[in-house]
Amino acid sequence: MAITAKPKAGVWAVLWDLLTTVDHKKIGLMYTATAFFAFALAGVFSLLIRTQLAVPNNQFLTGEQYNQILTLHGATMLFFFIIQAGLTGFGNFVVPLMLGARDVALPRVNAFSYWAFLGAIVLALMSYFFPGGAPSVGWTFYYPFSAQSGSGVDFYLAAILLLGFSSLLGNANFIATIYNL
């Protein structure tokens, strides 16, 4: 009997597998890859900020655009990179392996929390394209600055709420995994 090689999966098969996976290792890698995409995007925002500050009286960005880019840079670095890559992506990959478990306790909740995280990034970036533009409130959303109105602020706040929901689901899944397995 001859040993047959497993046929290579096509691009669509691999994409479908990533879209429908509930494997904690794949989801952890997807979290990390998406967080590093957010890191690269925040790096582009940082380059725009540095370009504006390169020479005195630079007109590369208006004051409002500068504040919007500064807000997007800070919030993207904090909410979409540091927390997600450092805790969620790494935790998804490592925690079940450290426990000797085959998977997390709630794999579908784990997958949903990733897709909610990705949706939060999309909402945050969409805020730039609505009337009023992206929020220019700083990443802290401190009240005197956050009193501005506009659809961009609403979309960005919806993104932060969706990200919080995603984090709650993911962390509840970690707690259930550690407690039950």
Model-based region annotation:
Residues M1-L181:
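...captures the hydrophobic TM-helix bundle architecture rather than a specific catalytic motif
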